[in-house]
């Protein structure tokens, strides 16, 4: 489903074709002020490298906060952060809540099932009412691609919007925390070969990661998966496409595994989960094809025995749990940059 200009739901084709890599509602760069400062974080696509690096540098400063006895800084004291999750989430919602709390913000988690949207109220009417409650920052997850853009366009001028995942389009904070994780372990993006493996067609994380990797100068990004799960337009982005996992993994420095997003699939795109694992699952034997010091990442939720073997997920080259830890600092950085200096 997608959101029309009234905030109601409709046909996803109205916003974008799922087979295309780029989305049609991206006009200009509504994330930036006239001075080039970050007002909203809606997508990594179109962000200058300087802003991406600024977010990563700021996150590095916040990592140390988690090691303190008092895990708080006053950057968002007096600010109100509303978490608006129209889709279910565990890691993203929890880490945003922790991040906002550590910035000393007041945090409200909207119960969507009990809200007026479940009674037929339009998305924009909900947003306008919440803006009238003097919200400063909306963190939005929505099943419709483009919903955070709609909210950013129509919310009160003092309100900032962070996209916590919209349909198949983007998950910018996941992309940023993935970049922070890669930088932490590999330092220099300009010498890396990065493989993204699995259901790329339905993955907003893959889109955000690809935009971030190319923005930061990674010379070789590989997309590996079945033909039925690869979107069009990857080659035009400079991405190398592989339909054979063993070939695609040879010599890579970073492996980002993706789950099968069965909830977004229509029709039978794949055989059984067991058959998928035989062909596309990351096992210790396949991991050995990568560089000896390669790291393994996964945005979660992880399906063991489908896209990844437990020996790999729990092995010494896995940095999956560290991604979650770094995610708090990255989301602190994004909220601090977007809303910390606003009036």
Curated annotation (Swiss-Prot):
Identify the EC number(s). 2.1.3.2
Any one Pfam family match given in the protein's UniProt record, by short name: OTCace_N
Disulfide-bond pairs as recorded: none
Which residues participate in L-aspartate binding?
A: 119, 204, 259
On whether Transferase is a keyword of this UniProt record, the answer is: yes
Q: Which reaction does it catalyse?
A: carbamoyl phosphate + L-aspartate = N-carbamoyl-L-aspartate + phosphate + H(+)
Q: What class of enzyme is it?
A: transferase
InterPro entries the record matches: Asp/Orn_carbamoyltranf_P-bd, Asp/Orn_carbamoylTrfase, Asp/Orn_carbamoylTrfase_sf, Asp_carbamoyltransf, Asp_carbamoyltransf_Asp/Orn-bd
Which BP terms does GO give this entry?
Answer: 'de novo' pyrimidine nucleobase biosynthetic process; 'de novo' UMP biosynthetic process; amino acid metabolic process
SUPFAM superfamilies of this UniProt entry? Answer: Aspartate/ornithine carbamoyltransferase (SSF53671)
Keyword field contains Transferase = yes
What pathway does this protein act in? Pyrimidine metabolism; UMP biosynthesis via de novo pathway; (S)-dihydroorotate from bicarbonate: step 2/3
A single cellular component GO annotation: cytosol
Q: Which Gene Ontology molecular-function terms are recorded?
A: amino acid binding; aspartate carbamoyltransferase activity
Q: Which UniProt keywords apply?
A: Pyrimidine biosynthesis, Transferase
Query: For carbamoyl phosphate, which residues are the binding ones?
Result: 91-92, 141, 171, 174, 300-301
Q: Which PROSITE patterns match?
A: CARBAMOYLTRANSFERASE
Query: What assembly does the database describe for this protein?
Result: Heterododecamer (2C3:3R2) of six catalytic PyrB chains organized as two trimers (C3), and six regulatory PyrI chains organized as three dimers (R2).
As for what it does, the entry says: Catalyzes the condensation of carbamoyl phosphate and aspartate to form carbamoyl aspartate and inorganic phosphate, the committed step in the de novo pyrimidine nucleotide biosynthesis pathway.
Q: Which family does it belong to?
A: Belongs to the aspartate/ornithine carbamoyltransferase superfamily. ATCase family.
Identify this protein by name: Aspartate carbamoyltransferase catalytic subunit
Gene from which this protein is expressed:
pyrB
């Amino acid at each position: 489903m997608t959101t029309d200009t009234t905030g109601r739901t409709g046909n996803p084709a109205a916003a974008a074709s799922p087979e295309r890599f780029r989305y049609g509602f991206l006009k200009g760069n509504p994330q930036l002020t006239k001075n080039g400062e970050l007002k909203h974080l809606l997508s990594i696509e179109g962000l200058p490298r300087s802003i991406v690096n600024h977010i990563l540098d700021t996150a590095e400063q916040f990592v140390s906060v988690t090691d303190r006895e008092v895990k708080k800084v006053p950057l968002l004291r007096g600010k109100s952060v509303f978490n608006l999750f129209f889709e279910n989430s565990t890691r993203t919602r929890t880490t945003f809540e922790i991040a906002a709390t550590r910035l000393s913000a007041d945090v409200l988690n909207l119960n969507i099932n009990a809200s007026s949207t479940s009674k037929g109220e339009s998305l924009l009417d909900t947003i306008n009412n919440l803006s009238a409650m003097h919200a400063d920052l909306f963190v939005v997850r929505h099943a419709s691609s483009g919903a955070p853009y709609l909210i950013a366009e129509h919310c009160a001028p003092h309100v900032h919007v962070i996209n916590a995942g919209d349909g198949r389009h983007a998950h910018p904070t996941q992309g940023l925390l993935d970049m922070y994780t890669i930088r932490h372990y590999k330092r220099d993006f300009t010498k890396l070969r990065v493989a993204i493996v699995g259901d790329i067609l339905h993955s907003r994380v893959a889109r955000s990661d690809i935009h971030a990797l190319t923005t930061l100068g990674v010379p070789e990004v590989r997309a590996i998966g079945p033909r039925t799960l690869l979107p069009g337009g990857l080659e035009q982005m400079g991405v190398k496409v592989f339909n054979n996992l063993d070939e695609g993994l040879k010599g890579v420095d970073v492996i980002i595994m993706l789950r099968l997003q069965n909830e977004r699939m229509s029709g039978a795109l794949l055989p059984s989960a067991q058959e998928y694992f035989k062909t596309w699952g990351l096992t210790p034997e396949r991991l050995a094809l990568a560089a000896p010091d390669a790291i393994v990442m996964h945005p979660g939720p992880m399906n063991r025995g489908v896209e990844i073997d437990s020996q790999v997920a729990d092995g010494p080259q896995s940095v999956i749990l560290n991604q979650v830890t770094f995610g708090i600092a990255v989301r602190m950085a994004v909220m601090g940059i977007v809303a910390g200096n606003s009036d």
